[in-house]
Amino acid sequence: MDYKKSLNLPDTPFPMRGDLAKREPGWVAEWEETQVYQAIRAASRGRPRFVLHDGPPYANGDIHIGHAVNKILKDIIVKSRNMAGYDAHYVPGWDCHGMPIEIQIEKKYGKHLPVTEVQSKARAYALEQIDRQRKDFKRLGVLGDWHNPYLTMNFSNEADEIRVLGRILEKGYVFRGLKPVNWCFDCGSALAEAEVEYADRVDPAIDVAFPFTDRGALARAFGLDEVDAGAIVIWTTTPWTIPSNQALNVHPEIDYALVRVTPTPVHGPLLLLAQERVEPSLKAWGLEGEIIATAKGEALEGLRFRHPLAAAAQGYDRTSPIYLGDYVTLDTGTGVVHSAPAYGIEDFVSCKAHGLADSDILGPVMGDGKFVDSLPLFGGLSIWDANPRIVEALKLAGSLMLVQKLSHSYMHCWRHKTPVIYRATSQWFAGMDVKPRDGGPSLRESALAGIDATAFYPAWGRARLHAMIANRPDWTLSRQRQWGVPMAFFVHKETGELHPRTVELLEQVAQRVEKGGIEAWQSLDPRELLGDEAELYEKNRDTLDVWFDSGSTHATVLGGKDGVLGGSHGAELAWPADLYLEGSDQHRGWFHSSLLTGCMLYGHPPYKGLLTHGFVVDGQGRKMSKSVGNVIAPQKVSDSLGAEILRLWVASTDYSGELSISDEILKRVVESYRRIRNTLRFLLANVADFDAVGQAVPYGELFEIDRYALAMTAQMQAEVQGHYERYDFHPAVSRLQTFCSEDLGAFYLDILKDRLYTTAAGSAARRSAQTALLDITQTLLKLMAPILSFTAEEAWKVLAGSALAKQADAPRVTIFTEVYHALPPFADGEALTAKWTRLRAIRAEVQRKLEEVRSAGAIGSSLQAEVDLYANAADHDILASLGDDLRFVLIVSRATVHADADDLRIEIAASGHKKCERCWHWRPDVGQDADHPEICGRCVSNLFGAGEPRTRA
């Protein structure tokens, strides 16, 4: 007889190989065809709501690995919340306006298109990009309302954004003023703080002499009767700002020195600089000198010095006063700061505080980076080309003390990677320290309070965002672009004042935009709204900062507080969101702008929690770079290894820091996946012939080890659900992996094989095991589903078609309509866990001894061994309670327990009996049945009799 055929060998259509790259597109198509997302919504209706508001990616270019990380994390959270019993929608969004798309249109069609044509082509381009990105996001297994996303360029969103502008204007936050803002010459526009990045750059660093003018006043400041000719010396890394100099700054508490030097410079023998900087400065200039007098900086206030280019061109024949400034330091330079208020924030603030009118501020640099033609010596030159010319002119004028090359970190445009300057322009601002008209706290105050009330994951994000808000300048709302939501103001042609009915007019414009998009503003004749007043007013041509677009989506999409605005998806979502989740750069981006708009509109943030993930780097910790050749595209990983591997990599990695990825790292993830898949295959195969409705064993009648396995499963489920609740995904993955490999694979399933394969197919022993396995399988699949979505769905379909096929009440469209599995109550769970934890420790010691004996060649497999255990009273009771089932737990052919006062002692010997050809145990009763001499008595009973007596394992 072929006894192998008498075994209950497992079988399942769930294949060992995942073939993920080939099979996953089929699941994506099936989810689309069967409307899985809509099924989830129907199953979740009426539950407590959980809102994750999607930070919109920009609608330009293919998605990269950072996008994949972001969307996978969001998908894990939304799926886990739905399965935890919430109604968690996922409405994806896209950021559609702004410079990058405008640049693409310019590249393709040139720079001279009419505005309306730029806008129509930009809309079409954005839609193309969205379609490409949407396909890639869906390929990652991300479920969402992909057919109805929110787009910042949807007419309703554009209209509501104009309404938001009206509300913050009405509250008193918005004002117009001349201020230095981040300016990109290539963009031809102001930049937001989040659009500026820093990179190393080499610039000329120069020491420049400003000649004395009123020597009598200078002498009095230093307590002298008179002074010779000389100059005060400044240090700067921006020679191009020298033509715009209007003041000098010194620190009131720093000591400044008059130094007589040799050889004598062009402007005279005396130099004025901070006393602490005299020695290094003279050494750098190649001069000798002695200090003849000192004075505190405050004594120098109001003294005037001649412009260093006065000798080179008559247009510079002016003087600059000294103002006091606490920001002056002695780290570098001379302790004297040159001030060009049009090109520096501190310079601007200082000069304005001393009464300089906006109209008197010198701003010769145009928006394209060139000096105005009328500027003496340098008119028409770009500021960068002018730098060496200015240095040469200073030298000819006798005002150049030193020029050196300096490598330093400098502001650059994040799009063009070109240098950015501060440039004073007339812009619209949201005031950080303006008190709103209702008398409430300032924007800065309410934003800082809002940060304190927000949960941060990880916790360090709070201090980072707090520091940014505490130190940031006013928000520059306006941009000088074409593809953006208009700041739809009517401005008086003579006074520059807004129309007195601006808030009302903004609503009228919004109603038009709601029907025709921002193009409606372009085509609007002011007379339609202003009548005869139209002759007095002009349309403001500025557009809103794109960070205002995305930063106001909590109102335009979620509907705002109490749903006042309605919102494009206000019915599905709610304000405030439970969570915003983005990369760490968004502390100064979307998190930041959303906080400010929320606080301006409602006095507090639009979110309850902020989750931050790090950037992706390669295996060596380097940033992804095409030039380095270390870029890993998510599309390539999906097409070769499968998106499931990307999902497992994301979930396995601590996202709070940098996420490392490489081919080697992905290989390790593949191995982890295979082990999980093999566990699932074993589980599915061994419940394939089981009917959950008609064959399940009541909990109280389950074998002891099966009850313990369920107690283990319950503990694991509680831990993993807790990790999901706290957004700690890598510990969740680790716990699932440990459960599969150690709790199941190396322990429970290893022991269970004998009972599953050798007992009668319908026996209580086997059905007890299958009952436990089905609970374990359902628990495991549902816990894995948020992460391993494709695999969990594949396995769920197999389970639904076999063990669960007769359950009438269970929806079978998808695993994602399920909630976490409800395990039976465990009255004895704690006692079981304590007992079996000790049993597992003893078993591990037995396995170690068995391995020693096997290595010595005394036995082949562990089943050839007979074990005697000598144990103290407590251990003896535990071991003896299993009776003959102890041998199945230890996977040996005999296990005998002996009482002993000492600690555990284990003796192992090779069995002298024959091996059963069916169960492979070495037993004394092999051959005692004449009809079946090759098998043991247990197997004879299981095949032809009443079955073996067994209740523990």
From Swiss-Prot:
What EC number(s) does its UniProt record assign? Answer: 6.1.1.5
The protein's annotated catalytic reaction(s) are: tRNA(Ile) + L-isoleucine + ATP = L-isoleucyl-tRNA(Ile) + AMP + diphosphate
Position of sequence motif 'HIGH' region: 57-67
Q: Which residues bind ATP?
A: 626
Keywords of the record, alphabetical order, are: Aminoacyl-tRNA synthetase, ATP-binding, Cytoplasm, Ligase, Metal-binding, Nucleotide-binding, Protein biosynthesis, Zinc
Q: What GO biological process terms does the UniProt entry carry, in alphabetical order? A: isoleucyl-tRNA aminoacylation
Where does the record place it? Cytoplasm
Molecular function (GO) terms listed? aminoacyl-tRNA deacylase activity; ATP binding; isoleucine-tRNA ligase activity; tRNA binding; zinc ion binding
Q: How is the cofactor bound?
A: Binds 1 zinc ion per subunit.
Q: Which cofactor does it need?
A: Zn(2+)
Task: Give the binding site residues for Zn(2+).
Answer: 916, 919, 936, 939
N-terminal signal peptide: none
Extract the PANTHER family matched here. Answer: ISOLEUCINE--TRNA LIGASE, MITOCHONDRIAL, SOLEUCYL-TRNA SYNTHETASE
Domain comment in the entry: IleRS has two distinct active sites: one for aminoacylation and one for editing. The misactivated valine is translocated from the active site to the editing site, which sterically excludes the correctly activated isoleucine. The single editing site contains two valyl binding pockets, one specific for each substrate (Val-AMP or Val-tRNA(Ile)).
NCBIfam families the UniProt entry points to:
ileS
On assembly, the entry states: Monomer.
Q: What is this protein called?
A: Isoleucine--tRNA ligase
- Whose protein is this, by species? Bordetella bronchiseptica (strain ATCC BAA-588 / NCTC 13252 / RB50)
Q: Which lineage do the record's taxonomy fields give for this organism?
A: Bacteria, Pseudomonadati, Pseudomonadota, Betaproteobacteria, Burkholderiales
